Amino acid sequence: MPEELSENLETWYKAVAGVFARTQKKDIGDIAVDVWKKLIVTTPDGVDINPLYTRADESQRKFTEVPGEFPFTRGTTVDGERVGWGVTETFGHDSPKNINAAVLNALNSGTTTLGFEFSEEFTAADLKVALEGVYLNMAPLLIHAGGSTSEVAAALYALAEEAGTPFAALTLGSRPLTAQVDGSHSDTIEEAVQLAVNASKRANVRAILVDGSSFSNQGASDAQEIGLSIAAGVDYVRRLVDAGLSTEAALKQVAFRFAVTDEQFAQISKLRVARRLWARVCEVLGFPELAVAPQHAVTARAMFSQRDPWVNMLRSTVAAFAAGVGGATDVEVRTFDDAIPDGVPGVSRNFAHRIARNTNLLLLEESHLGHVVDPAGGSYFVESFTDDLAEKAWAVFSGIEAEGGYSAACASGTVTAMLDQTWEQTRADVASRKKKLTGINEFPNLAESPLPADRRVEPAGVRRWAADFEALRNRSDAFLEKNGARPQITMIPLGPLSKHNIRTGFTSNLLASGGIEAINPGQLVPGTDAFAEAAQAAGIVVVCGTDQEYAETGEGAVEKLREAGVERILLAGAPKSFEGSAHAPDGYLNMTIDAAATLADLLDALGA
């Protein structure tokens, strides 16, 4: 390690150690913590994120990859060719004429890639009207046709022949292997194989979409989404080769789609790793140059909330940034109210789509990210994290292959069990507020208008992070509708505002995340009329103050509250202040509790 770097690291270490020392009121030499280890954060995949990355990391790794070259970790374009990513928007669930009008407006407003979602309302027979005025050789198409992909493909082929032009790029989106994971509609594997055989005879057409978002919808970690997607891709290639296609032709039929969340650096690395691992597969199969399969990115449905949906705009901005910087071929930003059936009441669909589209355009046109080749490249952190995540994802892929491949692992229940376990951990992290969701388990807006009951329905096939807390809010809304007020709990602030404010703020925020209104009567002193009045009016209270205040007046406050007939006494803080006390609270509210379970119990007690 260079001497200058070593000295800088030592200076940094002393500065950080000084913070710990001041917190513990000790000298630096006396603190009983390993500062470096204390600051390491471990991801759900088991990747340790160090507090600092420097040139020292380069000596342990090989940061030699360049953009546009195998294994394409740093993207598929070389210096000077970067023109950004495609802006994808999906259309459907409307009349063909309305869809056509929306498509033309979107193309004139910055959309470059057109997605189509088919249903009973919008079928293959409607494509001619929907695509009127669209140049198929200029606008890439991404199809979501469920079980009718064959009909849609035939209709598109006919339109292209009628126009006498090849497709700019057409992904038919057949996804039977991944669709079985989240229950989404798709063709059979036999139909998918035949689609690919037919598509292989046409230019710029790929039949197969390995849809990693299906794994994300069911709670997959980043490594799992990548590893399972690569395994599914290999399964498709094997089936296509068995059907008579050459390995080269089979590889040309595969495209990928990944879900991106607002965990910025993890998502940048996820897309980089996915390309690297697929490149390795292509290399083993003898065609390393075919590793440049399209990589579609879409904002993850799991991260979208129904409550305070405006925050979803911010989540989507970070996710789209990560996808673009990570090297996605194109990026689709879902509308901010995607989790709400029919959207936010009173908000037009045009507005929601415009904001989603403009999120991409802001990143491309105002921030100029599209003019930079691999913006994250060369970052010691991103390169190191990419390497570590690649190891974890390859381990997932290898484990699936060891079971006989993707289909065998699905049939045995291995894939489901893997996703269930990861989801339960995510759910627990949200419940304990270790995983923070703004507007949901942190900083909720209890004053927002309740959603109508028919718009609180959970999206099918998606395990949303916010669902458990939003179920509590739904209970609160029902209570409000019936009683004219929300369920309430009274706080008992001890000491002056400057002392109790931190914990009254914490308590208000926590209770609001469960739909409970916290009543703050201001500073109360045990033994006074104001204290007695507040206690007598409350069935459940939360005592709020400093640890010092608890030591001085906490036991007396609890005793007076019991004498006043309070049914349940909670305290904001840790149990240590009441160890061995004859008058201890019934429970504690702090950062270590299962907040979702605690709030559900409180709603039960309040009759909500």
Which residue stretches match the model-derived regions?
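Catalytic alpha/beta active-site cores
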Residues: 1-263, 293-294, 330-334, 487, ...
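Intrinsic disorder at enzyme termini
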Residues: 1-18, 23-24, 35, 39-41, ...
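Conserved, mostly hydrophobic/aromatic
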Residues: 46, 110, 164, 278, ...
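Short beta-alpha connecting loops at secondary-structure transitions
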Residues: 141, 179-184, 217-219, 299-309, ...
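Short glycine/threonine-rich loop-to-helix capping motif typified by GTGT followed
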Residues: 221-226, 261-273, 300-314, 343-353, ...
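Accessory "access/gating" subregions that flank catalytic or transport cores
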Residues: 234, 241-244, 252-260, 272-290, ...
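Hydrophobic alpha-helix feature that most strongly marks membrane-spanning transmembrane helices
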Residues: 273, 279, 283-286, 318-325, ...
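Flexible glycine/proline-rich, aromatic-decorated loop/lid segments
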Residues: 288-298, 307-341, 348-369
